[in-house]
């Protein structure tokens, strides 16, 4: 019985090796040092040496040392891309579409599993990105902190201009998450020195428009970005 299992186990090992490519260490290190991969992980050089990521959410990383090791995160991502498609929305391809797209192109990954990614597909279709507009709200007189500037991106659909439907677009916003009631001195210090955590938020543009123009009476300056639909979709 044991002898008959040996060829079967060997076949399984070979099939697994064929399913997931094994790039050389040099190639993996080259990709890990690529500026695009470093941007995907929001990495910057550490104060003394090495790397560190601006992202402090452990769910963003697949490797235990991912926040400080771009190469380890890349290797863990490559392994996770070949997880069973039955994981569905929990699959790495669904959680990290930008990583998936880039690694597929760089390593010619033609045999990746095909998870459904239903939640991501629904979310992406709802946004329907086609073009992007940089929005700069003017300062709010009752809030001195607004003079430091605030920008956001408006993601428009294909018919946004022709049908004048910018109100149906989405706004990609990055801002400080402030809890409690810090005094003005502490608020200014923490605001200038990065003492508040920053969060990305995707909200309907009409909500931001109401906040800035109706509630705060602020002017909005719009600058359409020279991006293709493909670039906007990324």
Q: What is each model feature region?
A:
Residues 9, 19-60:
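Intrinsically disordered, low-structural-confidence terminal and linker regions
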Residues 2-11:
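Sec-dependent signal peptide recognition
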């Amino acid at each position: 019985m044991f002898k008959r299992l040996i060829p079967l186990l060997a076949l399984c090992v070979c099939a697994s090796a064929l399913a997931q490519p094994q790039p050389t260490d040099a190639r993996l290190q080259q990709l890990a040092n690529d500026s695009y991969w470093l941007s995907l992980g929001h990495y910057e050089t550490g104060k003394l040496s090495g790397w560190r990521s601006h992202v402090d959410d452990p769910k963003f990383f697949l490797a235990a040392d991912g926040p400080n090791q771009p190469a380890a995160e890349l290797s863990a991502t490559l392994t996770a891309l070949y997880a069973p498609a039955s994981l569905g929305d929990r699959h790495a391809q669904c959680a990290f579409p930008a990583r998936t797209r880039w690694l597929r192109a760089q390593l010619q990954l033609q045999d990746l599993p095909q998870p459904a990614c239903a939640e991501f597909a629904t979310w992406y279709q709802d946004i329907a990105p086609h073009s992007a507009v940089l929005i700069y709200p003017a300062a709010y007189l009752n809030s001195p902190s607004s003079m430091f500037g605030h920008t956001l991106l408006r993601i428009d659909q294909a018919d946004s201009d022709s049908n004048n439907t910018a109100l149906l677009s989405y706004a990609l916003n990055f801002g400080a998450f402030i809890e409690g009631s810090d005094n003005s001195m502490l608020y200014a210090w923490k605001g200038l020195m990065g003492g508040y955590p920053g969060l990305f938020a995707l909200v309907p543009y009409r909500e931001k428009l109401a906040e800035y123009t109706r509630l705060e009476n602020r002017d909005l300056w719009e600058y359409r970005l020279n991006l293709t639909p493909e670039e906007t979709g990324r």
